[in-house]
Amino acid sequence: MKRKTAAIVAGCAAAAGIAAFAIAPGKASAGEKAPFYGRYFAHRGLHTSDGSAPENSLTAFRMAANVGYGVELDVHITADDQIVVFHDDDLERMTGVSGRIEDFTLEQLRELRLAGTGEQIPLLTEVLDVIRGAGPIILEFKTCQRRKALCEKTCAILKDYPGDVCIESFDPRILRWFRKHEPGYLRGQLACPPWEYGEGASRPLAFLMGNCLVNFLGRPQFIAYKIGHKPLTVRAAEAMGAMKVCWTSTSHHDKKDNDAVIFEHYRPELYL
């Protein structure tokens, strides 16, 4: 009986050790976190519910910059290796044209308009010219087949940008790339409850990602988790030092117990 009990205890200790290794965040100094800590970030720019300023449009980013908000934005790579700011993998919801954005050239994308307005899908360079360091940026990398090219070309653009930029992604392989090649950028693991991952993620993978058990790949310094219940593993990673970022807030009340807030459809103060 004693041997059996000892074996159970040893097994539990080993499992706890493996879990702790898997979820442990990366290290970052207070100075590295400071530009992003305690800030509100306009989700895809300060877009409007009436559609006059579509998400991820130059108008939405200009409005956010004029107030001084941080912004969260999404980057994709086009068929001709241009870095554009757009959220969905498919163009249809925002442009009415079906097709994956990575299969279109920039010239083809320039023919499209966002949500029936005169706004085009912007280049990352155009967005950065609008923001010009007015507030910090959380830059979300969308997963794609050409992850390496997306990361390399985006970093080449960011090299001379004078403002504060951190990166995040649902794809831990992108964080792993940054950990290895561009460790100077603060890294964030995007996550949500396992049952909310789409068909592209198997149940085991969704479980691992939703519980941040993939942190060992990219060692994120912050976790951007969907507002709602957080699994024990996520709270443990936060207790180990990961910054707490929530998305997507639609209420002032969401600032409680968070270090930064990604928001939309209301106007908070600049700081938590």
Residue ranges with predicted function:
Residues 2-272:
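Phosphate-group recognition and catalysis centered on beta-loop-alpha active-site segments
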